[in-house]
Amino acid sequence: MANMTLTKTPMPEQEPQVRAHNFKEVALGYTAEMAMEEAGRCLNCKKPKCVEGCPVNVRIPEFIAKVHEGDFKAAYEIITSTNALPALSGRVCPQESQCESKCVRGIKGESVAIGRLERFVADWYRENVNAMPEKTVSNGIKVAVVGSGPAGLTCASDLAKKGYQVSIFEALHTAGGVLVYGIPEFRLPKAIVANEVRKLEAQGVEVMTNMVIGRVLTIDELFEMGYKAVFVGSGAGLPMFMNIPGESLKGVLSANEYLTRTNLMKAYTEEADTPVIKSKAVAVVGGGNVAMDAARCAMRLGAEHVYIVYRRGEAEMPARLEEQHHAKEEGIEFKTLCNPVEILGGEDGRVNGIKCVRMELGEPDASGRRRPIAIEGSEFVLDVDTVIMALGTSPNPLIRSTTPGLDTNRKGGLIVDENEMTTRTGVFAGGDAVTGAATVILAMGAGKKGAAAIDAYLKE
């Protein structure tokens, strides 16, 4: 009989006053008993809408049934038949707007905690089994994957399972893409990402780092080297700024740079050689998950005051509610309906404040959200010594500029057809390189679709 409790089984977390001063993972995960209890809430629907809400089509009721039975290994095998990275998606996927939003238990009460259960299964397997996947017999056909973020890793894994000889070309010195440079340790421990990369290598995937495609090699040169198809999953790492006065002052930086220094280069550790700005008061401009990540890192790096400055209201914030909740618990102050108009500096060329104007919401704009309108005469100044711009990112133009015939849209995203083929034959693309900055799970879905399309293309 199903567990008809209306609320999710709570997941243990570090206390806010403790975690705000360390980079250890905030969410501690379910115990086996908690997972089995929560799995009992699943009704095992005959027509599961939750599966329709999953971009990688995990057979959700099936794996949850195995969790309820205590057969965690079988649950893992069900998940990984369609999801190559469950330990990652279980942590950072916005389940509340995807699979869990379709759960019928959410009609009266809370949905089943699908993400927490997926994370539990992946963690249990890593801690108790961690068998490396077997290598599929190679068909001898070479495929190149540019980028090792969620799209690239998923595409490479699916192609390797089909027998292709896959090589990943990663620009940075560590594989993982946004998973290692963008998402903080307290949300996604890097050891977990490294373990997923080791699994890929066990499948026979070659992972080459420090390989900037467009500089070290071009797409055309990859074809000359014998690769029969290329998947571009290079992400969207080009930060956006506001173009307001004062953005060139010392103490203004992009969230992309700030998070890369903190996460990838581990600048928060005593032994790190990478410098990272140490601040007393920080304004993070933006309202997405990246803004929350940057603000929470600033708090952990010793800032006394951290502000989220966002031009719309909290209801319009794109950040996950969980991330907003955690940020507030950790003492971060939200300055909503505020828009920066100038960054102020002293004679030393350093930031000493940010001038903002208060906003009100008008009619919806093209995004579907109500358009913010400045309130005349409402300017005020926040005393800060650091401003972090978390306004989104766009794809880097390097690959496009070095690949004749590769077209992009006005936002820099690669143009693809329904099969993720770009305007160059044999070159496929997916994830943020196409859509601009989006979620990890959508990038994984694009990588999965790209692998299937490449397989079909090479079999023609």
Go through each PLM region and give its residues.
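Ferredoxin-type iron-sulfur electron-transfer modules in oxidoreductases and energy-metabolism complexes
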Residues: R19-E37, V58-R91, K108-K135, T262-N263
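Local cysteine-cluster metal-coordination motifs and their immediate loop/turn environment
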Residues: G40-E62, P86-I107
